[in-house]
Amino acid sequence: MGQFDNKTVIITGGGFAALKDGSAGSIGYGIATAFAKEGANIVVTGRNTAKLEEAKARLEADYGVRCLWVQADVAAGQDNKATVQKVVDAAVAEFGSIDVLVNNAQASASGVTVADHTTDQFDLAVYSGLYATFYYMQACYPYLKESKGSVVNFASGAGLFGNYGQVAYAAAKEGIRGMSRVAATEWGPDGINVNVVCPLA
């Protein structure tokens, strides 16, 4: 019996990516593995269908859990709110509930200075990170309220420490950190835990 038996977890950016030695190199997949070890039903999202299919196959074979993958590209210039709603609707249709939301996915142009950053590069980080997190939280809220669930949002040390060449990434992550604090205040009375993780890498 695991801590998350029959619970449903959505993990953005949860596809499998292999390192040169064949081991898993995706943070999202590592998170999915941790929840699968505890018996959770897993929903992984991302842009690359091959990586998502590989994640599903490995999680189901290695841990005996059920896994659903949903392709979801939340880049700028698209109807990202509808894309996110598609993921949430698919998760509820498959598993009947949402107990944990992990907002892990984020794309950005690394190593570009403030002076040289383009609007498109800035939009890439803001849409894939800040807006996506906002839309997922909104879409999952009624289900998390019902399940007394949890949200885990990924921010970053890049914003906390002003990492060189990380302006858009840092801005998006600091937005996520602030939004998480507000949501924790607003959603606490509903029994929803909202936490933010700030990796240093």
PLM regions and their residue ranges:
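Canonical Rossmann dinucleotide-binding motif of NAD(H)/NADP(H)-dependent dehydrogenases/reductases
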Residues: G2-N41
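Residue(s) in the substrate-gating loop at a strand-loop-helix junction
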Residues: S156
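Active-site helix of classical SDR
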Residues: M137, A172, S180
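Rossmann-fold cofactor-recognition segment
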Residues: Y63-D79
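Substrate-binding pocket helix/loop in short-chain dehydrogenase/reductase
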Residues: V112-V114, T118-D123
